[in-house]
Amino acid sequence: MTLAGGALFGFWYALLLVSFASSIGATLAFLVSRVLLRDWVQERFGRHMGAVNAGFERDGSFYLFSLRLVPIFPFFLINLLMGLLPIRPWRYYWVSQLGMLPATAVYVNAGTQLGQLQSLSGIISAPLLGSFVLLAVFPFMARWLLGYMQGRRALAAYDRPQRFDNNLIVIGAGSAGLVASLIAATVKAKVTLIERGKMGGDCLNTGCVPSKALIRSARVAQYARRAGEFGLAPMSVEVNFPRVMERVQRVVETVAPHDSVERFTGLGVNCVQGDARILSPWEVEVNGEVLTARNIVIASGARPRVPDIPGLAQLDYLTSDTIWDIREAPQRLLVLGAGPIGCELAQAFARLGSHVSLVTHASRIMPREDPEVAQQVLDAFLRQGMDVHTGYDPVRFTADEEGQRCVFTTAGDRRELAFDRVLLAVGRSANVQELGLEALGIGLTRAGTVAVDEYLRTAIPNIFACGDVAGPYMFTHMASHQAWYAAVNALFGRFRKFKVDYSVVPWATFTDPEVARVGLSESEARDNNVAYEVTRYDIDDLDRAIADSEAHGFVKVLTEPGRDRILGAVVVGYHAAELINEFVLAMKHGIGLNKILATIHIYPTLSESNKFLAGEWRKARKPERVLSWAERYHRWNRG
């Protein structure tokens, strides 16, 4: 109709008529919705509508203008929806007319040019071609304009400094903050890195590095117990726990120079120790001094979550942050949580001599993995004497002269466990307190992480967030991955912005057996109705695994039906975290199983399992008709 109006009445008359007619029609639909539906919806869903109404009363006009300017949703749905929300009809009318006016002008212009056609040759005239080009680019122009307006709106309440001390301020010196700072310094930007604790963050000081050092000591102790399997005399294993923990600290101290103030200062980063608070989109206060920067990156990480359970606060509980301070192994260790952290540390302490009880409210350990994967790890735990309780919720902790106990309940059952120390491994919470985010209007997600867009921007367009504080994946390698996008978008986003690539995200749980995965699991594929075919290779048949007495586990790959394109892969077994990387590379660069099969793998290595899996995939799809003719040919050739 808009095109027809332009063709019949010319540009200005049509623009006037169509603009008013569409706005009046939209307002009439709005009023019908308000009269017939608003009271019923507000009464029925009042509990849920409170926050929506409050937000719309504050920013409703801008939301409506955005929906009108960038016509993503059908206008008739917008008319009905807006009638349910707290906006006055007059405001609805003029905001709608203003928001629809640019698109109306573009379409009326196209109709005007079409109406002036005198012959087919006029189709390639400059005015008509220009109108078609304008129609094509308008959605992109509208989105750019909307983004520009949102940015100006977010910054309008603050006074922008005339000059900046820094190009970039990074808050947090964990994996994300270190990488973001390094990138900025590498491209010769002036960057200040603020850290309130130790350089290197959780990964170096309380996470990845110390836990893997502890796991290694525990594995060696387990190997000593298995001496007879390797033809050695049986060994009596005596674990000197204080020396084990001293070794863990030596490992941390050896790695620490990689993340030190001295190294990063030498690379061009200004390192500051202290608590950071963001005062404005360009100002950060630290140690009583206000620093300015054109852009800010929040990389403040996360901390162990402490559940609110009666009696817990009165105990000297352990977390993944504090467990490295102990020098006496608990005789009875209770571990709450059976995710990666809980499973890794539970098994390590069991191998170092503690009697471990692992308790989780989930129906199985490692709930993010397929059941058969979790079962392999569970079987190993049970063989090593661990107690595992799934589906139980802790309801109360008690402590008296007889010791410490925890009461757990499940459907129709109640248990009480005695313990000496309890380790909390029930997840992690983003460090967002005392940064000044609420005052700036920077929101959080339901998971409690900083809300960011696909470019890692917060609600303030020059403040970015990356790593554990932003989620959605709390992995060190993901923090480093996000940091590149945050730093580059902050420094060069005015020229080109990059969306974070989450298409191929690998991770590993360093239990024994190890579990490593990338892409879809079989459970996720089923839940999301993704068509797939599954291929499996059991590692107990692999020569190198047999030679190493580590012949257990499997490799499983999901592929598109009828194709060798990999949708996901999981490896369970010895050095699974190393083996998965071939599939990570393949998925990232579109390499299928046929090319993995055609690649020479060194013999004897564990990585041959990946090639053998590709062989199993190929074998299941062998061309039976061609092989039948080949058999006849060979029979004929024998005479």
Predicted features, each with a name:
Residues 171-173, 185-197, 202, 209, ...:
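Flexible, glycine-rich terminal cap/loop adjacent to redox cofactors
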Residues 166-193, 342-351:
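N-terminal Rossmann-like FAD-binding beta1-loop-alpha1 element of flavoenzymes
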Residues 313-328, 416-496, 578, 582, ...:
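FAD-site-proximal beta/loop scaffold in flavoenzymes
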Residues 208, 300-359, 384-388, 438-440, ...:
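Glycine-rich dinucleotide-binding loop and its adjacent helix/turn
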Residues 19-79, 84-90, 118-119, 140-154:
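Membrane-interfacial helix-loop-helix
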Residues 182-189, 194-329, 362-366, 372-373, ...:
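Glycine-rich flavin
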Residues 234-235, 270-273, 277-285, 291, ...:
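A Rossmann-like FAD-binding core segment of flavoenzymes
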Residues 369-376, 466-526, 603-625:
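A conserved FAD-binding loop/helix module that cradles the flavin
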